[in-house]
């Protein structure tokens, strides 16, 4: 899910 950071900076 860390890759989601690329699309959703809020997940970082």
Curated annotation (Swiss-Prot):
Compartments (UniProt record): Secreted
Tissue: Expressed by the venom gland.
Keyword annotations: Secreted
Gene Ontology, cellular component aspect: extracellular region
Annotated family: Belongs to the SA81-like family.
Name under which the protein is recorded: Venom peptide Sa81
